[in-house]
Swiss-Prot record:
One of its GO terms (molecular function) is DNA binding. The keyword Transcription applies. It is found in: Cytoplasm. It comes from the Bacteria. Keywords: Cytoplasm, DNA-binding, Transcription, Transcription regulation. It comes from Bordetella parapertussis (strain 12822 / ATCC BAA-587 / NCTC 13253). Belongs to the TACO1 family. One of its GO terms (cellular component) is cytosol. One of its GO terms (biological process) is regulation of DNA-templated transcription. Disulfide bonds: none annotated. PANTHER family: TRANSCRIPTIONAL REGULATORY PROTEIN YEBC-RELATED, TRANSLATIONAL ACTIVATOR OF CYTOCHROME C OXIDASE 1. InterPro entries: Integrase-like_N, TACO1_YebC-like_2nd/3rd_dom, TACO1_YebC_N, Transcrip_reg_TACO1-like, Transcrip_reg_TACO1-like_dom3, YebC-like. Residues 1-21 are annotated as: Disordered. This is Probable transcriptional regulatory protein BPP2422.
Length: 243
C-alpha cells in the first residue's frame, strides 16, 4: 500500500465531518436523547450518555442544546421514538460497509439505504454479511509527534487492550467499549488529546481503492452519511493519498 497514508485518510474524513457540522449536531442530539431515555439523565452513571455528551462538546455544541436533549429523553416527552437499526452491504470492489441508523420508520430507512447502495455501485447485504470483518471497540488516534511513552502509560493504566504506532508516527489505542470513558479520562488527566476517538466498528483488514473506484466509493459514503436516519457509516476502505 505504497500510496496509503492512515493520517491523510483520518484528516480527510475529519474534514468531511466538520463540513457537515449542522448535520452532525442533529445526529448527536438524537444520540443524547436516546441515551438519556434508555439510561437516565446522569452522565456519570450512564456511559452511553457520557460518550454522547463528550461528542457534543467536541463538536462545540452549546450546553443548553445538550441539556434540552437530555431533558427530552429522560423526561420521556412525547415525540419521535427512535429504534436503532444496523444495515450491512458492499461498496465498490466488494468493500465492506456498515450503516448504523436511528429511525422512527424502519421501512423508510431501509428503502433509502438500499437506494443509496444501488445508485452508487454497491448493494445492500443481509445481516451478518460483513460485520465479522469489523471489531466493536473503543478507538483513539493521536497525531504524529504525540509522545508515545505518555500515551502508552496513560492507556495501559486505564485498561487499554492494544497500542500501535505506524511509520508516520500515528498512534492508535484500542480498548473494550466498556472501558472507553475511563481511557478517555486517563488521557485527559495526562493532558493528551486524541485527534479522533469513539466507540466504533474497526475494520480488521483494510482494502485500498484508487482512481475512479476511490471517487465512486467516496460518493457512496457521502450519500449514506447524508441520509437523515444514518448515525454512523463504517468501511474497511482506505484511499490513496492522491484522492
Amino acid at each position: 500500500m505504497a500510496g496509503h497514508s492512515k493520517w491523510a485518510n483520518i484528516q480527510h474524513r475529519k474534514g468531511r465531518q466538520d463540513a457537515k457540522r449542522g448535520k452532525l449536531w442533529t445526529k448527536i442530539i438524537r444520540e443524547i436523547t436516546v441515551a438519556a431515555r434508555a439510561g437516565g439523565a446522569d452522565p456519570d452513571s450512564n456511559p452511553r450518555l457520557r460518550m454522547a455528551w463528550d461528542k457534543a462538546t467536541d463538536a462545540n455544541m452549546p450546553k443548553d442544546n445538550i441539556q434540552r436533549a437530555i431533558q427530552r429523553g429522560a423526561g420521556g416527552a412525547d415525540g419521535e421514538s427512535y429504534e436503532e437499526v444496523r444495515y450491512e452491504g458492499y461498496g465498490i470492489g466488494g468493500a465492506a460497509v456498515i450503516v448504523d441508523c436511528m429511525t422512527d420508520n424502519r421501512t423508510r430507512t431501509v428503502a433509502e439505504v438500499r437506494h443509496a447502495f444501488a445508485k452508487h455501485g454497491g448493494n445492500l447485504g443481509q445481516e451478518g454479511s460483513v460485520a465479522f470483518m469489523f471489531k466493536h471497540c473503543g478507538q483513539f488516534v493521536f497525531a504524529p509527534g504525540t509522545s508515545e511513552e505518555a500515551v502508552m502509560e496513560a492507556a495501559l493504566e486505564a485498561g487499554a487492550e492494544d497500542i500501535a504506532t505506524d511509520e508516520e508516527g500515528v498512534i492508535e489505542v484500542v480498548c473494550a467499549p466498556a472501558d472507553f470513558t475511563a481511557v478517555r479520562q486517563a488521557f485527559e488527566a495526562a493532558g493528551l488529546k486524541a485527534e479522533v476517538d469513539g466507540v466504533v466498528m474497526k475494520a480488521l483488514n483494510e482494502t485500498e481503492l484508487t482512481g475512479e473506484d476511490a471517487v465512486k466509493m467516496q460518493k457512496l459514503l457521502d450519500v449514506l452519511e447524508s441520509l437523515d436516519d444514518v448515525q454512523e457509516v463504517y468501511t474497511n476502505v482506505v484511499f490513496d493519498e492522491a484522492q
